[in-house]
């Protein structure tokens, strides 16, 4: 049995108006396995304010930890995860 490759989707955070979050972006946020966020607290707040629910694992990803997080995220993608 072959495993399918994961998917990486980049979603911009709406600034100033939560209504700017597209339905497609909302769908991806809900079905992701992992949410790699610059600030996980703000992402959780965004999801709460928009009423979105997710079972995704929240992981920080920013300038200070990118070097160590990239291999972990690539491994997750190779194992079929949606990030």
Predicted segments — roles?
Residues 1-64:
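Glycine-rich, flexible N-terminal cofactor/catalytic loop recognition
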Residues 78-83:
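Short glycine-cluster motifs
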Residues 28, 72-76:
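CheY-like receiver
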Residues 65-73:
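Glycine-rich, highly charged phosphate/nucleotide-binding loops
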